[in-house]
């Protein structure tokens, strides 16, 4: 998209830099000196600079966030996307799981008759929530939730936890779950709690100043159910665990019976004068130990998935072995 005729390139750049300075919540944690960065880039902005070059200049700031929630989007006049600058969650990290291997060797209907399946729509794509028992163990329960961008009814949650309540342990597999509704992920976490749990606090950016923040403590109440599961749990994570999935991990992290295994998890909108759209994270999570979660949560036990072995999921196998 070409900037509006009356819009100066420097005005667009300075507007975006000011929005970041006044609204973005984690500049200090990310080590971004927005004033220095804006000054150094701003000196290279010219009025005759093409739109794509100007976009790339703004994207330098965007990419410094290391934040998949805060993209910059350039659009055509028709409204179609032209350029998107956002953080690549997977850059520098190995693959965390392979869905084909998972289905062929562990969860497929033909080999896992003791796994129940709930087909749910995820924005036009059908996904399956799995729960029950894998063929590898009749006593260790397995729950697979590939997305929180879905609706799981309370009655369905009760069915899941009724099915597994007599298991000796549980594997909760959320690898590749890019998030969705934090209310759903929090509700699922509450099924693993025996008492109200302080999980940390959310820090909200409430003003333009560098220190204009307000903290909101987070306490999660156990699910009102007779089927809560308080036996040992392993949560399988990878870099694709983002947004509401990190919220799930954040809420389960204080629970002493929970172990995280696999890889590190992944962690207000409007537009600038020429129509490019922005999104900026206006809050950050800090866990019960004071750790910032925007860069993700490290597993208790790191396990690297070997994508060259088409018959084995090393992460899932390690979880089964750990819980035996």
Name every feature range the model reports, one short phrase each:
Residues 261-299:
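BRCT (BRCA1 C-terminal) domain core and associated BRCT-interaction motifs
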Residues 1-170, 174-190, 194-203, 232, ...:
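Flexible, low-complexity junctional segments that flank or bridge functional domains
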Residues 179-232, 271, 275, 286-288, ...:
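Gly/Ser/Thr-rich loop/hinge elements
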Residues 299-324:
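Low-complexity, Gly/Ser/Thr/Pro-rich intrinsically disordered linker/tail segments
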Residues 176-182, 240-242, 266-268:
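Acidic, metal-coordinating catalytic cores used for nucleic-acid/nucleotide bond scission
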Residues 170, 242, 256-269:
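Short, well-structured beta-strand/strand-turn elements
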